[in-house]
Amino acid sequence: MLSTERIEFKEQSDPRADLHLLIKYPLGENGHKFVVIIPKGRDLVAVSSMTRVDGGQQDKMKEVMEEDSDEWKNWLHECRMQLIASGVDWGIHLGHSKSGRNGPLQAFNVSEPIWFDGLTKNELMQTIRRLWLSKLGLIHEIKFAFGKGNGKPGPVDDWENKKQSTQRIGSPSPPKPKQVHIDESMSFGDGFDPEDWI
């Protein structure tokens, strides 16, 4: 299905999935990586893509946060509104500080499920395209507001903290689960409180 559209893809080994593909879309050097997964025991295809924010752009965000916190809050609010208006599922990762998760935008994820009863080639391709345009919109917002950056991905505190919390000392790791377990930590709406947006 994907090869007829000249989309590059590579199958990944994943014991939690019946199928796990890494694809590049759109064609050409500006393509981004997307994941297409059929989780075991589910009647759906999950399509998603993660974007890390450039380290130089994160530094510029920190400057704006210090110089004009209202401008920063408004910019972040508008980004959230843009993601909501796109109609896709999304999650953002903000930098951590002593006072909480109020740092710069470090990464964001866009995703969308397609249930088998609605799965067609057209629906899969339109989903990938919709996710791409959602990503592209936020990427352009970041570049417009904070420049091109330094060309190197910046840190993502959530990922570092997750790595540290999964390391075990003194006891073996539990066996790998046979079913897909959903990580709700990146879901939008969990404990929804608009005050947390600031």
Where do the model's predicted regions map?
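Charge-rich, low-complexity N-terminal segments
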Residues: 1-46
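Short, highly charged C-terminal tails/helix-capping segments
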Residues: 141-198
